[in-house]
Amino acid sequence: MARIAGVNIPDHKHAVISLTYVYGIGRTKAKQICSAAGVAESTKIGDLSEEQVDTIRNEVAKFTVEGDLRREVSMNIKRLMDLGCYRGLRHRRNLPVRGQRSKTNARTRKGPRKPIKR
């Protein structure tokens, strides 16, 4: 197994699919990385030479991925909460942030129903 950005990448899958195992890399970025590294998208990771894997590593290093990206996203949410803006309040109360209705639905974000105590 090749190790890219601290993640074990499966050898038996195509390069584009394998790169999506890294947090922050989807199909589009994986295709960009493969073309920049000069690797065919349908090539399996196990068939690549060590030099090709190194070029892929260097291309991935140009993006914000894994721990840095997770930290950045959590800091953005924390900043919204500290500002006290509407989106921050919605995050703080564990309610939908992007304008969805919350009177009847939003069970995923709110969690299981709480019984009414009489």
Swiss-Prot record:
The record's GO CC annotations read:
cytosol; small ribosomal subunit
Signal peptide residues are none
Q: Which UniProt keywords apply?
A: Ribonucleoprotein, Ribosomal protein, RNA-binding, rRNA-binding, tRNA-binding
Output the Gene3D superfamilies linked to this UniProt entry.
1.10.8.50, 30s ribosomal protein s13, domain 2
Q: Does Ribonucleoprotein count among this protein's keywords?
A: yes
Write one Pfam family the protein is assigned to: Ribosomal_S13
GO BP annotation list = translation
> Carries keyword rRNA-binding?
yes
Q: Where is this region: Disordered?
A: 93-118
User: From what superkingdom does this record's organism come?
Assistant: Bacteria
For this UniProt entry, the molecular function terms from Gene Ontology, in alphabetical order, are: rRNA binding; structural constituent of ribosome; tRNA binding
Q: Which SUPFAM superfamilies match?
A: S13-like H2TH domain
Q: What does this protein do?
A: Located at the top of the head of the 30S subunit, it contacts several helices of the 16S rRNA. In the 70S ribosome it contacts the 23S rRNA (bridge B1a) and protein L5 of the 50S subunit (bridge B1b), connecting the 2 subunits; these bridges are implicated in subunit movement. Contacts the tRNAs in the A and P-sites.
Protein family: Belongs to the universal ribosomal protein uS13 family.
Its quaternary structure? Part of the 30S ribosomal subunit. Forms a loose heterodimer with protein S19. Forms two bridges to the 50S subunit in the 70S ribosome.
Protein name in UniProt: Small ribosomal subunit protein uS13
From which organism does this entry originate?
A: Saccharophagus degradans (strain 2-40 / ATCC 43961 / DSM 17024)
Q: Which gene encodes it?
A: rpsM
